[in-house]
């Protein structure tokens, strides 16, 4: 089951959060859902060179809040914040409401080579430049290992190296526990448009396990148990020294 289902959808509410956070009635829900799709499509087309890995959307009353996770925030912000104003105007035009309040927060991705979307974007760019796919995958693995990820899986499918028959090849380094719900799996897909056709790219990045904090209630009047393996404290008897 863990190998078939989307890794992010399986872990929603456990290690993953929703990309859109808002509530709507049954009448307005389709409209707002289409707005989210149009906003993400507009941002990816206009700022594809900025390395945007994710777009988080939140709605509060008539206010729209966006959080952009990017590898190059300077491309979006621009000089003295001019890029933010241009992006805000473009979003208002996309949704067809120039009076909508739009707040934009740009967050820089700390570890670029540990982000699944940015790794998939790097592989896509290399394949479109006609670099051999095995060499591209090996370079992506090396970059991810330097970033300190615990596991990585890369899958590329299509007419690899211009072969007449399409096939799928994948490689894995480290652990990628897809069945473990507490495992933090970053997953992304991309397409590479080559002269021989479209290649599909899938990337799984294992960043560690998220363990919930165990809170045990102690009954009133009971003393907490001593941790196993802990050496008992030794006290010296000095009661007779002053006598």
UniProtKB/Swiss-Prot annotation:
SMART domains: KH
Swiss-Prot/TrEMBL keywords: Ribonucleoprotein, Ribosomal protein, RNA-binding, rRNA-binding
CDD domains from the UniProt entry: KH-II_30S_S3
Protein name: Small ribosomal subunit protein uS3
Residues covered by the KH type-2 domain: 39-110
Keyword Flavoprotein: no
UniProt feature, compositional bias: Basic and acidic residues: 233-243
Membership in a protein family: Belongs to the universal ribosomal protein uS3 family.
Region Disordered: start-end pairs: 216-243
One GO location term (cellular component): cytosolic small ribosomal subunit
Organism: Prochlorococcus marinus (strain MIT 9312)
UniProt GO molecular function: mRNA binding; rRNA binding; structural constituent of ribosome
Function: Binds the lower part of the 30S subunit head. Binds mRNA in the 70S ribosome, positioning it for translation.
NCBIfam families (UniProt xref): rpsC_bact
Quaternary state and interactors: Part of the 30S ribosomal subunit. Forms a tight complex with proteins S10 and S14.
GO biological process: translation
């Amino acid at each position: 089951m863990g190998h078939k289902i989307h890794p992010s959808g399986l872990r929603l509410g456990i290690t993953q959060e929703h990309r859109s956070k808002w509530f709507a009635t049954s009448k307005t829900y389709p409209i707002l859902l289409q707005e989210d799709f149009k906003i993400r499509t507009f941002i990816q087309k206009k700022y594809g060179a900025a390395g945007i890995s994710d777009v988080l959307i939140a709605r509060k009353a008539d206010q729209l809040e966006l959080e952009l996770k990017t590898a190059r925030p300077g491309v979006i912000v621009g000089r003295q914040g001019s890029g933010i104003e241009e992006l805000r105007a473009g979003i208002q035009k996309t949704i067809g409401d120039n009076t909508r309040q739009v707040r934009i927060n740009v967050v820089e991705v700390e570890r670029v080579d540990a982000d699944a979307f940015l790794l998939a974007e790097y592989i896509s760019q290399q394949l479109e430049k006609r670099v051999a796919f095995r060499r591209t995958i090996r370079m992506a693995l090396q970059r991810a290992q330097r970033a300190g990820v615990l596991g990585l899986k890369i899958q590329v499918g299509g007419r690899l190296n211009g072969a007449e028959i399409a096939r799928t090849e994948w490689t894995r380094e480290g652990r990628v526990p897809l069945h473990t719900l507490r495992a933090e799996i970053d997953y992304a897909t991309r397409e590479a448009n080559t002269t021989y056709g479209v290649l599909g790219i899938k990337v799984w990045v294992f960043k560690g396990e998220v363990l919930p904090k165990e809170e045990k209630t102690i009954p009133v009047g009971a003393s907490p148990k001593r941790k196993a393996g802990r050496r008992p404290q030794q006290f010296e008897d000095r009661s007779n020294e002053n006598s």
